[in-house]
């Protein structure tokens, strides 16, 4: 029988043949991106590939992930929903406001969102938070995963508009989207300022 170890609220390590990062599946029987489903004593866990998810990689690196069962999350750069689906599992009684700019990615994402009561897909430019302010309530966590040269500015705009006092901003800086020639270390240092 697989062993379950809770790493943080809603995030687990399931050991069946090997250790695998997992979340409790909010949509039993359904996969999102080809991940494995593991059933243990009536619960179904979805494996979470940290090579396909920056947030998953953060968990493996032992970052404190500030997501709780009832958290309200603004996810900027939802793409087709790989990581958003795991956030949805974790914040099962909360909400995931998921902003994506690309219509093609959003088309794929809509199918996932239609099966999960806590995902709210928003086709919009994350750099223009006022355009979706009528949809998004104040949030506990903002996770940004956009590939724009002004990533830090976009994060700051959204934080000012939506982040609750004592909320958390998780910013995934994509150095090559900012400058293809500069040293990533220098870019990171500059963006954090």
Swiss-Prot record:
Protein name: Fibrillarin-like rRNA/tRNA 2'-O-methyltransferase
UniProtKB keywords: Methyltransferase, RNA-binding, rRNA processing, Transferase, tRNA processing
Domain of life: Archaea
SMART domains: Fibrillarin
Residue numbers binding S-adenosyl-L-methionine: 82-83, 100-101, 125-126, 145-148
One Pfam family linked to the record: Fibrillarin
UniProt cross-references to PROSITE patterns, sorted A to Z: FIBRILLARIN (PS00566)
Biological process, per Gene Ontology: box C/D sno(s)RNA 3'-end processing; tRNA processing
InterPro entries the record matches: Fibrillarin, Fibrillarin_CS, SAM-dependent_MTases_sf
Self-association and partners: Interacts with nop5. Component of box C/D small ribonucleoprotein (sRNP) particles that contain rpl7ae, FlpA and nop5, plus a guide RNA.
Gene responsible for this protein: flpA
EC number of the protein: 2.1.1.-
Similarity annotation: Belongs to the methyltransferase superfamily. Fibrillarin family.
Listed GO MF terms: histone H2AQ104 methyltransferase activity; RNA binding; rRNA methyltransferase activity
Function per UniProt: Involved in pre-rRNA and tRNA processing. Utilizes the methyl donor S-adenosyl-L-methionine to catalyze the site-specific 2'-hydroxyl methylation of ribose moieties in rRNA and tRNA. Site specificity is provided by a guide RNA that base pairs with the substrate. Methylation occurs at a characteristic distance from the sequence involved in base pairing with the guide RNA.
Keyword tRNA processing: yes
NCBIfam families: PRK04266.1-2
């Amino acid at each position: 029988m697989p062993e379950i170890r809770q790493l943080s609220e809603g995030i687990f390590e399931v050991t069946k043949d090997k250790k695998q990062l997992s979340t409790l599946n909010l949509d039993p029987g359904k996969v999102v991106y080809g991940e494995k489903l593991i059933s243990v004593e009536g619960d179904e866990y979805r494996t979470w590939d940290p090579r396909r998810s920056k947030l998953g990689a953060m968990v493996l690196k032992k970052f404190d992930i500030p997501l709780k069962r009832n958290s309200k999350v603004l996810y900027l750069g939802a793409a087709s929903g790989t990581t958003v689906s795991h956030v949805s599992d974790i914040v099962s009684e909360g909400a995931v406001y998921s902003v994506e700019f690309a219509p093609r990615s959003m088309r794929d994402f809509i199918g996932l969102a239609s099966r999960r009561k806590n995902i709210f897909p928003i086709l919009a430019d994350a750099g223009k938070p006022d355009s979706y302010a009528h949809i998004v309530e104040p949030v506990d966590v903002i996770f940004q995963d956009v590939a724009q040269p002004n990533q830090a500015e976009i994060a700051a705009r959204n934080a000012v508009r939506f982040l609750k006092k004592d909320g958390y901003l998780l910013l995934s800086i994509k150095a090559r989207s900012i400058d293809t020639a500069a040293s990533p270390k220098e870019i990171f240092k500059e963006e954090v300022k």
